[in-house]
Amino acid sequence: MDNYIQFPRYSIYLIPNKLFINQVEKLLLKNNVKYDNLEISQYGLHYTVKAPFYLSHLYNEEELINSFQEYFLSNQNKSYKEVFNVLGLKKIKNVFALEMNSNEKFNFLCNDIMRYFDLYRKTLNQQEVQKDIKRFSNLTSLEMEYYLIWGYPYLFEFSNHHISVSDIKKEIIFDNSIKSLNYSNISLMRQDSINSKFISISKSD
């Protein structure tokens, strides 16, 4: 069911380097899964820093891009460039995900980005909220509170450092072949329609 309010949608993702992407694809092929055939492939392999959002009518895309570029030119916290250890594979809701270690500096950066760019997120009216929230199910009272404040329920204590690699339709056996993760860049992404992939429209290496 199409419960989206409008397109395009925007998001901010940390994008793994090519080595990590190749390792994930090889892992999935060992389990007879092709990443490009999965529904989640429209998002690409990534860690979500700012979940997909609708752009406020108060701003345009050019202003969003300029703000994104200025933020990373002035921010000296480059903790996303560190090497992160892969802790294992786990089920998170309806996906299999590789979980990574984290640290306070990295968590602070991600939360700061999420809050900073919330300025550009469209505030939904009551009718739009009733439609949009159908994308989520069985929210706790605190998850609901986060959704109403930030437009996304799985934040802070309900989130951890992970990259979704497959759905749960087929069991994935992890052979510990992926030891670490380096991010290639942090990207401002755009999705133009319900079936289109998220594409990068600006990035910081």
Q: Each predicted region: which residue ranges?
A:
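Basic, often amphipathic N-terminal segments
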Residues: 1-84, 88-90, 105-205
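Generic recognition of long tandem-repeat/solenoid scaffolds
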Residues: 12-14, 96-100
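Short acidic/glycine-enriched loop/turn segments that link adjacent beta-strands
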Residues: 92-94
